């Protein structure tokens, strides 16, 4: 943020040349006071934006130090959250792949039930493993599955 952001300051060059030296000095002092007030307000705004400084009286150096610490902390936190999002996306893709494989195994098991074989209780899934007709195509035990089917949730993708 530069000194010129959000502030309208008249320059000395915009004034007519016929002003006295005292008028020029007064005008220059007013512009300088306005610039200093803007800087002061900006430091107060920055101080109030940093949680560890809110409402405290702090020097400009302390405000800058704490603001720097807070920005670094938030960057680390954002990086960690982005890693979590990436991990969840990978996990979601893996789970969706497993769901598709199980649905495919279930549909192939249902097709095989239409063609009676010598043993109607065992079928072969897409991986070539033998499964029970009562298994639903799952390679895991039924003890680990929830009693109610969980609805699939889509991961909301945000533009980054």
Curated annotation (Swiss-Prot):
SMART domains: HLH. Gene3D superfamilies: Helix-loop-helix DNA-binding domain (4.10.280.10). PROSITE patterns: BHLH. The modification N-acetylserine is found at residue 2. The keyword Isomerase does not apply. The keyword Hydrolase does not apply. GO terms for cellular component: chromatin; dendrite; Mad-Max complex; MLL1 complex; Myc-Max complex; nucleoplasm; nucleus; protein-DNA complex. High levels found in the brain, heart and lung while lower levels are seen in the liver, kidney and skeletal muscle. Residues 1-40, 103-160 are annotated as: Disordered. The modification N6-acetyllysine is found at residues 66, 153-154. The modification Phosphoserine is found at residues 2, 11, 107. Changing residue 154 to R: Loss of acetylation, kept nuclear localization. Transmembrane segments: none annotated. InterPro entries: bHLH_dom, HLH_DNA-bd_sf. Changing residue 142 to L: Does not affect MYC transcriptional activity. It is found in: Nucleus; Cell projection, Dendrite. It is linked to Pheochromocytoma: A catecholamine-producing tumor of chromaffin tissue of the adrenal medulla or sympathetic paraganglia. The cardinal symptom, reflecting the increased secretion of epinephrine and norepinephrine, is hypertension, which may be persistent or intermittent. Polydactyly-macrocephaly syndrome: An autosomal dominant syndrome characterized by progressive macrocephaly and post-axial polydactyly, a condition defined by the occurrence of supernumerary digits affecting the fifth finger and/or toe. Additional variable features include ocular anomalies, global developmental delay and autistic traits. Efficient DNA binding requires dimerization with another bHLH protein. Binds DNA as a heterodimer with MYC or MAD. Part of the E2F6.com-1 complex in G0 phase composed of E2F6, MGA, MAX, TFDP1, CBX3, BAT8, EUHMTASE1, RING1, RNF2, MBLR, L3MBTL2 and YAF2. Component of some MLL1/MLL complex, at least composed of the core components KMT2A/MLL1, ASH2L, HCFC1/HCF1, WDR5 and RBBP5, as well as the facultative components BACC1, CHD8, E2F6, HSP70, INO80C, KANSL1, LAS1L, MAX, MCRS1, MGA, MYST1/MOF, PELP1, PHF20, PRP31, RING2, RUVB1/TIP49A, RUVB2/TIP49B, SENP3, TAF1, TAF4, TAF6, TAF7, TAF9 and TEX10. This is Protein max. It comes from Homo sapiens. The gene is MAX.
């Amino acid at each position: 943020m530069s000194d010129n952001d959000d502030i309208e300051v008249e320059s000395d060059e915009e004034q007519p040349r016929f002003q006295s030296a005292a008028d020029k000095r007064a005008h220059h002092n007013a512009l300088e006071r306005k610039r200093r007030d803007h800087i002061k307000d900006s430091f107060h705004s920055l101080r109030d934006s940093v949680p560890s400084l809110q409402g405290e009286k702090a020097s400009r150096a302390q405000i800058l130090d704490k603001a720097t610490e807070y920005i670094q902390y938030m960057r680390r936190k954002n990086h960690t959250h982005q890693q979590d999002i990436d991990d969840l996306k990978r996990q979601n893709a893996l789970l969706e792949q497993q769901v598709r494989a199980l649905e495919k195994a279930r549909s192939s098991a249902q097709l095989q039930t239409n063609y009676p074989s010598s043993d109607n209780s065992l079928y072969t899934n897409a991986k070539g493993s033998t499964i029970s007709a009562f298994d639903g195509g799952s390679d895991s035990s039924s003890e680990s599955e929830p009693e109610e089917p969980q609805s699939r949730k889509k991961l909301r993708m945000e533009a980054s």
